[in-house]
C-alpha cells in the first residue's frame, strides 16, 4: 500500500500537477515570495525527460499530448535558460522561474511607455501596478532605486529599454525569418540552441556554421516571459526568449 501510494503521488506530480513555492518579488503584487502555486501539466502536456543525465547542457525531453497551448496572460513555471551562460541556452533542473507569458509563438511583443501591449488587441496586459510606476517615473529616479533601464540589445541602433521595447517577433515552429547583418544577433541564441551551430558575420555575409544563410526556419516554439513587477524582474526583456521545451506547466 505504501509503495502504491508513493507511485501514485509521484505519477500525479509528473503527469498531472505539481506545486512550487514563489521565490522573490518579480511577480508582485499578484504573487508574493513564500506563496505556493499549483501547476497544471495536463493542459499543454507533461514534459517527460528522455535522458536523466542532467549534467548535460541541453535538455533531452518530449512532451505528451495536451489540450491547449500557453496563451498570452498565462502564468507559467519554466526552467531558466541562461543559468550557466548569458550567451548560450543551457538546462539546469533545479533553477525554475515563475513568469507571465507576454508573447506566445507567432506574436510580436511591444512595450510602449512602460506598458506591455497585447499582441492582438494592442491593449495593455498584465498587472498594471508596476507598469504604471515605470511609465511615470524618470530614468534617473528609477536608476537611483537600482532599476536597470537598458534592455536586451539585439541591435545597438535600436537602443531598447524596459520602457520602450520591440517590436520583437516571437518565433513559431515552421516560421521563417530573414537573417542579415543587422538582424542576426536577434536570433543567435535560439538558432544555436536548435542547431548547435553559431551565427556569425564574415566578409559582410552571415554564416551558420560554415554555410552562408539568409533565411532560417524555426524548429520549435518560443515564448516571451516577464514578471509583473517590471521594476524588479530578470526576464525576457533582459535575457531573451524561452524555448517551449523548458516550460514545465501553466499555473492554475
Question: Which residues fall in each region the model found?
Answer:
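Extended hydrophobic leader/signal-anchor segments used for secretion and membrane insertion
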Residues: 1-252
Amino acid at each position: 500500500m505504501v509503495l502504491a501510494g508513493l507511485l501514485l503521488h509521484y505519477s500525479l506530480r509528473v503527469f498531472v500537477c505539481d506545486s512550487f513555492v514563489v521565490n522573490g518579488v518579480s511577480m508582485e503584487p499578484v504573487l508574493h515570495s513564500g506563496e505556493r502555486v499549483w501547476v497544471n501539466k495536463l493542459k499543454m502536456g507533461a514534459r517527460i525527460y528522455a535522458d536523466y543525465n542532467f549534467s548535460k547542457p541541453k535538455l533531452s525531453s518530449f512532451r505528451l499530448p495536451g489540450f491547449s497551448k500557453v496563451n498570452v496572460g498565462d502564468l507559467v513555471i519554466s526552467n531558466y535558460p541562461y543559468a550557466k551562460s548569458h550567451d548560450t541556452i543551457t538546462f539546469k533542473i533545479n533553477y525554475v522561474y515563475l513568469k507571465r507569458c507576454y508573447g506566445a509563438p507567432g506574436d510580436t511583443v511591444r512595450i510602449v511607455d512602460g506598458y506591455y501591449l497585447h499582441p492582438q488587441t494592442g491593449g495593455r496586459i498584465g498587472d498594471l501596478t508596476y507598469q504604471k510606476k515605470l511609465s511615470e517615473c524618470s530614468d534617473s529616479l528609477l536608476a537611483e532605486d537600482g532599476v536597470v533601464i537598458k534592455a536586451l540589445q539585439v541591435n545597438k541602433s535600436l537602443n531598447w529599454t524596459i520602457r520602450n521595447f520591440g517590436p520583437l517577433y516571437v518565433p513559431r515552429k515552421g516560421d521563417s525569418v530573414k537573417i542579415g547583418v543587422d538582424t542576426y544577433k536577434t536570433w543567435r541564441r535560439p538558432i544555436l540552441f536548435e542547431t548547435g551551430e553559431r551565427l556569425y558575420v564574415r566578409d559582410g555575409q552571415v554564416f551558420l556554421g560554415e554555410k552562408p544563410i539568409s533565411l532560417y526556419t524555426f524548429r520549435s516554439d518560443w515564448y516571451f516571459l516577464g514578471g509583473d513587477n517590471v521594476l524588479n524582474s530578470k526576464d525576457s526583456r533582459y535575457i531573451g526568449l524561452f524555448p517551449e521545451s523548458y516550460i514545465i506547466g501553466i499555473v492554475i
